[in-house]
A protein has these predicted regions:
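Low-complexity, acidic/polar, glycine-enriched regions of mature
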Residues: 2-241
């Protein structure tokens, strides 16, 4: 009698086990396809290092005044995804051109300095090569649906090296306040600068632990996650307002 009564529970347990196994196999199959059968290459990090120099700035060029974000500017993130403990072959990269902001320059002869600068990025418009990833970061990690804006504000005046006016790419350190995910931190970032008669271009990146800006590294179902550090990249192009 007891044996007969136990059969329904045993059968139900077996069905649950089979159902659970099917779900696990389906998830693992999807991840295998995602990471192995269809690996994607990442866009290269934003950089000016390999770019050709431009013509030296003309002696009569005036930089004093207000400059604003121009077409071609980009900002975004770069993270390495993982399948369990196995890193993917390339980075997940999301970028947007939805950037606004200005910089004010002063000039004395050939000496040029940035007196103030502030920029804002609409992180809700970040796009990668995966629509599913773009949807997930709205509610996990960056949580762009809750914190749709990231900003930077220059902390103190910044002089440009004299060699910047020779058309060469120069390397400087820029200190300012980054506000990401609603948290603000003062950071110093290495930046590449290139100056022409009509445009000032600044390219750089900031790598940080997710927790530094009160974020939690994204994880989807415990199967797909990212490493514990993220990189913010930017390529800002400024033209006279």
């Amino acid at each position: 009698m007891a044996r007969a009564l136990s059969r329904p529970r045993t059968k139900r347990g077996a069905l649950l086990a089979v159902g659970g196994s099917v779900v696990v196999v389906a998830v693992l199959g999807f991840l295998f396809i995602y990471f192995v059968l269809f690996p994607t290459s990442s866009p290269k990090p934003l950089s000016l290092s390999s770019s050709a120099a431009v013509a030296p700035v003309s002696s009569g060029t005036t930089f004093a005044g207000r400059w604003t974000i121009a077409t071609g500017s980009l900002a975004g993130y770069r993270v390495r995804e993982k399948l369990g403990f196995l890193p993917a072959e390339s980075d997940a990269v999301g970028r947007t051109s939805a950037i606004t902001g200005t910089a004010t320059f002063a000039q004395s002869g050939r000496a040029v300095s940035a007196r103030a600068a502030s920029f804002s990025v609409d992180v809700l418009k970040l796009k990668s090569n995966e629509a599913m990833r773009d949807q997930h970061i709205q509610t996990i990690g960056i949580q762009s649906a809750t914190y749709p804006t990231a900003t930077f504000r220059l902390s103190s005046p910044l002089g440009l090296p004299a060699s910047a006016l020779n058309g060469n790419v120069v390397h400087i350190s820029v200190t300012g306040v980054f506000t990401i995910h609603g948290a603000s931190r003062r950071e110093t970032v290495p930046v590449e600068i290139r100056v022409s008669n009509s445009e000032i271009q600044a390219v750089g990146s900031l790598t940080f632990p997710w927790s530094e800006f009160n974020m939690t590294a994204p994880s989807v179902g415990g199967f797909v996650s990212v490493t514990n550090r993220a990189t913010m990249e930017f390529d800002l192009r400024l033209r006279r307002a």
